[in-house]
Amino acid sequence: MPRRCGIDTSILVRLATGEPAQDFDRVVAALTHLVEVEHVALFASHMVIVEAYVALQHHYAVSKPDAKAALRSVLTSGLVAPS
């Protein structure tokens, strides 16, 4: 059975926004290594998803539909799954 690890809100927001670019690339590389090499199943809890949804709107001025779409994209990418 693969090990499961949760990500926090800041990581989910970074994955959804791609900002800042240099950190985004580093985070994606590290998470990809965990999933593909170390066979870790990454997840975002429901609370983390809700916090990221609010943060995208409040701090990044992302509309509700765009925030939903960005989070859906991350959570269906195969890298991170909802819990």
Tell what function each PLM region has.
Residues 19, 43-48, 69-83:
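Acidic catalytic patch
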Residues 12-13, 49-51:
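Short, catalytically relevant binding-site loops at active-site mouths
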Residues 1-44, 59-66:
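Short, well-structured N-terminal submotif of metal-dependent ribonuclease cores
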Residues 53-57, 72-75:
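Amphipathic alpha-helical segments within well-ordered protein domains
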